[in-house]
C-alpha cells in the first residue's frame, strides 16, 4: 500500500481573504502545474512497488474521475513509467469516484498479482465548498499472494440508484444535491454493507481495531463513523489534505496500514453511490513496510497562494510568458523512445561501464555499436553539481530552475527541478526523479522526468 500527497498546500483561510467568502480551516493538497492524475498515479505506484521488491504485476488498473485523456487508455502511460512487463494488462477504470474502491475490490476478488492505482484532481467553483474541501493525490495497492502486509479477510458492497453528485461531459466542476439528502441515504447503506462484510469475514464488530470512513458527503461520513460505536475511527485527512475522491479510500487505507500493529483488524468503509466495506488483518510484515509514509508527506509541504492555485486550475488566465510556446510532442518519436521518455532508462556500455543519458547506440569511450545494457535510472538518486535559474525560458510558473545532476554510480544529466523555489536549491543537494508533464499542446501531454529535492530525513 502507498499514498502520494503533492508537495503544495492551500491554506483554506486564504480563499476568504481574497474573495470575501468561502474557505475554512486547515489546508488542502494541490497538485503542481506539471502534475495530472497520470503522474500522481505513477508516483503512488512507484512507492507501492518500492515496498515490494521483485513484484511483477500481471495487471494494472488505473481509476480516476479526472483522466488526462478520453478515448485513449491512460493506464498505458502508468504502465510504461513503472516499467511493467509488456504482457501485463493495463486498463482504465474511470469516470466515477466509486471506481477507486471498485477496482481495489475487483483485484482482491481476483487471482494473480494486480497493481491498483488511483488518483484525482479535485476543485470547484471559486469560493465553493467543493473547492475548499477537495484535495489532490494518489494511492496504490499491490494485491497478490505471498508475503503480505495486510491479509484480506472479506468485504461486501451495497448499490443503490440515487443522484447526489454529478458532472456532465464537458463540465469543469461537479454539482451536488442538498447535503441532507445524501446524509439520509448513505448511513443505512453503510450499515447493510458493514453487517454483510463482517458476516463474510466471520467476524464480530468488536474484533475490528480501526476503521477509515470515506465519503464525498462529510455529514454522511460523520453519521456512519458514529454508528460504528466503539471502533477507533482514523483521521480522514480532511483537515490537512482534503478529499481526494477516487484516490481517497486507498489513501486512507494506506494511512491506516502504516500505523497498524500486527494482528489488528482494519476496516475500510466507502460511501459513494452505495457502500463498500473491506476488512483486513495487519500481518507481521506491516511494521516499517512503508517507503514514504503518508504522514511524512503531509508534514513535508509548502504553502501556495490562492492566486497561483486559481491560475494552475485554469480559473483565471494570466498574461503568458512573452516566449514561443513549445511545439506539439511527436507521438511517433515518443513511441520510438518510450523506454527513455516514460521509464527514464539510459544505456550502459558493457565494455567500459560508461552510462549514457539519454541512451546511445555507440559508446563515447570506444567505437563499439549496440553493445549496451539497459540502465533504469528513475529510482537512482543524484546530487546537484550546479544549477541555474532561468527567467527567460517559457514556463507557466516561472522561473525555471535547471540543475546538472550527478547520479549515484555514474552518469550526468541536465534536468529541470520541480516542487521548489530558487531559494530552496543549493549545490550538493540530493534529488530524486519524478514523473511530470512538460507541457500540453493540441491535447497531447508531453510526459517526462524532472528532479525534486529529497525530503529531509530520506
Language model segments and positions:
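Condensing-enzyme catalytic core mediating Claisen C-C bond formation in acyl metabolism
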Residues: 1-37, 128-184, 188, 261, ...
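Claisen-condensing/thiolase-fold acyl-transfer catalytic domains that form or cleave C-C bonds
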Residues: 38, 42, 67-68, 85-87, ...
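Phosphate/pyrophosphate-binding loops at sites that engage ATP/ADP/AMP, CoA/4′-phosphopantetheine
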Residues: 44-58, 191-209, 228-229, 414
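Cys/His-rich short segments
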Residues: 323-381
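Short aromatic-glycine-enriched beta-strand elements
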Residues: 392-404, 445-448
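Short nucleic-acid-contacting surface segments enriched for D/E, G, S/T with interspersed K/R
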Residues: 419-433
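OB-fold/S1-family single-stranded nucleic acid-binding modules
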Residues: 434-458
Amino acid at each position: 500500500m502507498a499514498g502520494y500527497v503533492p508537495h503544495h498546500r492551500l491554506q483554506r483561510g486564504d480563499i476568504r481573504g481574497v474573495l470575501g467568502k468561502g474557505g475554512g480551516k486547515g489546508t488542502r493538497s494541490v497538485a503542481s502545474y506539471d502534475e495530472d492524475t497520470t503522474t500522481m498515479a505513477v508516483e503512488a505506484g512507484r512507492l507501492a512497488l518500492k515496498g515490494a521488491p521483485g513484484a511483477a504485476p500481471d495487471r494494472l488498473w488505473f481509476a480516476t474521475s479526472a483522466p488526462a485523456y478520453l478515448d485513449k487508455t491512460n493506464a498505458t502511460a502508468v504502465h510504461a513509467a513503472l516499467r511493467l512487463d509488456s504482457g501485463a494488462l493495463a486498463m482504465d477504470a474511470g469516470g466515477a469516484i466509486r471506481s477507486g474502491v471498485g477496482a481495489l475490490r475487483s483485484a482482491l476478488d481476483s487471482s494473480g498479482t494486480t497493481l491498483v492505482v488511483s488518483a484525482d484532481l479535485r476543485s470547484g467553483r471559486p469560493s465553493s465548498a467543493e473547492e475548499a474541501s477537495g484535495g489532490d493525490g494518489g494511492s496504490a495497492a499491490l494485491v497478490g499472494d505471498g508475503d503480505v502486509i495486510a491479509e484480506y479477510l472479506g468485504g461486501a458492497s451495497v448499490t443503490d440508484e440515487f443522484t447526489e453528485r454529478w458532472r456532465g461531459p464537458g463540465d469543469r466542476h461537479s454539482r451536488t444535491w442538498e447535503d441532507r439528502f445524501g446524509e439520509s441515504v448513505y448511513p443505512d447503506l453503510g450499515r447493510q454493507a458493514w453487517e454483510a462484510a463482517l458476516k463474510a469475514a466471520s467476524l464480530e464488530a468488536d474484533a475490528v481495531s480501526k476503521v477509515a470512513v470515506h465519503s464525498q458527503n462529510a455529514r454522511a461520513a460523520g453519521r456512519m463513523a458514529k454508528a460504528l460505536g466503539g471502533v477507533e475511527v482514523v483521521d480522514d485527512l480532511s483537515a490537512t489534505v482534503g478529499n481526494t475522491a477516487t484516490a481517497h479510500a486507498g489513501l486512507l487505507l494506506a494511512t491506516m496500514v502504516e500505523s497498524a500493529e500486527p494482528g489488528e483488524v482494519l476496516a475500510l468503509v466507502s460511501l459513494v453511490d452505495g457502500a463498500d466495506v473491506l476488512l483486513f488483518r495487519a500481518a507481521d510484515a506491516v511494521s516499517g513496510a512503508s517507503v514514504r509514509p503518508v504522514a511524512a508527506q503531509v508534514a513535508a509541504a509548502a504553502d501556495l497562494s490562492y492566486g497561483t492555485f486559481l491560475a494552475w486550475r485554469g480559473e483565471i488566465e494570466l498574461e503568458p510568458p512573452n516566449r514561443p510556446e513549445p511545439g506539439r510532442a511527436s507521438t511517433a518519436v515518443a513511441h520510438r523512445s518510450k523506454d527513455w521518455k516514460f521509464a527514464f532508462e539510459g544505456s550502459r556500455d558493457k565494455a567500459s561501464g560508461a552510462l549514457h543519458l539519454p541512451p546511445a547506440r555507440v559508446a563515447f569511450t570506444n567505437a563499439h555499436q549496440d553493445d549496451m545494457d539497459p540502465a533504469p535510472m528513475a529510482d537512482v538518486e543524484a546530487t546537484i553539481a550546479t544549477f541555474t535559474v532561468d527567467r527567460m525560458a517559457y514556463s507557466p510558473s516561472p522561473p525555471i530552475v535547471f540543475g546538472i545532476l550527478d547520479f549515484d554510480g555514474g552518469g550526468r544529466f541536465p534536468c529541470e527541478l520541480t516542487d521548489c523555489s530558487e531559494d530552496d536549491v543549493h549545490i550538493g543537494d540530493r534529488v530524486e526523479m519524478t514523473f511530470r508533464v512538460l507541457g500540453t499542446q493540441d491535447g497531447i501531454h508531453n510526459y517526462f522526468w524532472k528532479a525534486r529535492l529529497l525530503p529531509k530525513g530520506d
